[in-house]
Structures are given as C-alpha cells and as structure tokens.
Design a protein with these regions (language model features):
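Preference for the N-terminal adenyl/adenosyl cofactor-binding alpha/beta module
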Residues: 1-297
C-alpha cells in the first residue's frame, strides 16, 4: 500500500470536494429570502433579484432541511459559519461513501441484491476499463437481482450521463444505508442534494479515485479506509494542533480520531486483555497464535 499516494490523493480530494459542494450549495441561494409559488408539480422560488431553477417538492423539502442544518451547525450563530460546517460535513460524507464503494466494488463486496449479495457489477468503473460505469448499462439497471427502486421515467428524462449517475448513486447509497448505516445513513436529505456535479468528467472526483489510487491498494485490506480518513483530515489536524487556544467543537475529531493500524490494535489487545486472560486462566496455548505478544523473561 503506497501511503504517499494515499496522502496526496486524500488531501487534494478534500479541497476538490469542498469546492464542488460549495458550488452546488450556492445554486440553491440558501441565504436569500425567496417567495414560494407553485407551478404544477414544481416549486418556484424567487425575489426581485433572482429566480431559482424550478424545484420538485422533494428538492424543496431537502433545501428546507439544508437551511435548518446550516443553522444547527453554526458555532458562532452566523449563517456563514453554518454554511462552512455543512460544506465540510457534506464533502467528507461523499468522500467516505465513494471511497467505500470503490473498496467494495474492487473486492466484489457490493451488496446490491435483496439478500445483500454482490452481483459483480461495478458502480464507479468498468472491469474492462471502459469509460462508463458498469452500473449505467441498461442490462445492469434492469437486472432482476438489482435491489434499487429506479424510476425509469425520471431516469430517462435526465439530460446527461453525469445526472443519471448521480441519480443511481443516491439510490445505491440509500440501499447501502440499510446495511451500513454508519457510512451511508444519517441526516441525508441535504447530503443527497449537495452531491457534486460532473463526477464522471475527466476532472471529476470519481475519475480521480480510479486514476490516482491503484486498484491494488484497495485489495490489500480495509485499512486503506482508515489511512484515507487520517490523511483527509491531516491539514485540519495540523492546523488545530498548532493553535494555542481551546479546541472548537468542530476541531475535536481532527485531533482525537486518529487511525490505528491493525498491528497496533493486536499488540495492545494481546499484551493487555490477552495477558490478563492467560495469567488468570492458564490457557497458554493461545499464545502460539499471537504474533505481537511479549513473553516475560
């Protein structure tokens, strides 16, 4: 596992995704007072300066949730601070989700059937290195084993492959949220709304994952997720630790939640709980399978 590649990728990805999320957020003019009118199945929001692109009822409700979340996350009561926190939260969420999907698709672990089994279909890439994700092939979207609630009328009205991909990706995240809620669930309405655009473009995040992190790194074990988490937060961790004041609530995860490699966990367990068990139960045969246990002289 090439950690220098992972570090460079994660640090660059943070900036890339935060910019993309901020651009998406700005399209909804969440800091504007807008009047609401209804036109058929759509909601029109406007004032004397701007008019938003018509929203569906679902999008309107997600925008409302987004505004509430901005207010809730603000650390100093200002709307701008709340926006910054939402951008950070959303960017990390999509980083984590897409990286997790990449890990699962390369290890044939994507649980996309009703009984949560893999169909061997990639979501972000193609096994034959084609330029389009396998999941978007009509034969895969209509696979009877695929447990996604796809509205094909809605899907076919989307004007380009990036929009179609975002639609399917959100459905996949909803599916995975029933299985791995720690990564794919939570307060997701506004997270879905702020999914960055053009993920499949040459300079999009999905393309960055595929091209910059060799597949072999994802096949060396799940530790890659932990390293990417630590490197993603590296700059904020360094900044927070160099400050001399009291940590803000939002800074605490950066300085306390560090990735612990598998061997360190085993070392700690074998030489603490493991040692206690052997000393009190005499089950010394266990030691033969412990790689990091330090025997007494």
């Amino acid at each position: 596992m090439d950690k220098s590649i992972l570090k460079k990728f994660a640090i660059e990805s943070r900036e890339m995704l935060m910019t993309a999320v901020e651009n998406k957020l700005n399209k909804y003019y969440v800091d504007e007072e807008l009047e609401k009118t209804q036109s058929g199945d759509l909601i029109i929001l406007k004032n004397n300066r701007i008019t938003l692109q018509p929203l569906t009822f679902e999008e309107f409700n997600k925008r409302t949730t987004l505004i509430s979340r901005i207010k809730d996350l603000s650390e100093d009561g200002s709307f701008e601070n709340g926006k910054k926190r939402v951008i950070e939260e959303t960017a990390y969420t999509w980083f984590n989700r897409i990286v997790a999907i990449r890990y699962m698709e390369l290890n044939d672990m994507l649980p996309l059937t009703k009984d949560n089994q893999s169909l061997g279909i990639r979501v972000l890439s193609s096994i034959n290195n084609e330029s389009h994700p396998e999941i978007l092939k009509i034969g895969n979207l209509t696979n009877t084993g695929l447990d996604l609630k796809i509205d094909f009328d809605k899907y076919n009205k989307l004007i380009n492959e990036n929009e179609q991909f975002n639609y399917v990706l959100n459905l996949i995240c909803n599916k995975l949220g029933t299985i791995i809620p720690q990564v794919f669930d939570g307060i997701t309405d506004y997270i879905d709304l702020l999914l960055p655009e053009n993920l499949l473009s040459d300079n999009g995040f999905v393309n960055k994952v595929i091209k910059e992190v060799p597949e072999g790194n994802f096949k060396e074990g799940v530790e890659i997720i932990g390293w990417l988490y630590q490197y993603y937060n590296q700059i904020e961790k360094d900044r927070a630790m160099s400050s001399k004041g009291v940590y803000k609530k939002s800074e605490i995860p950066y300085v306390t939640q560090l990735f612990t490699p598998d061997w360190i966990v085993k070392y700690m367990v074998e030489n603490s709980l493991g040692r206690y068990w052997v000393e009190h139960n005499g089950d010394k045969d266990l030691i033969n399978n412990w790689k990091y246990f330090i025997k007494d002289n």
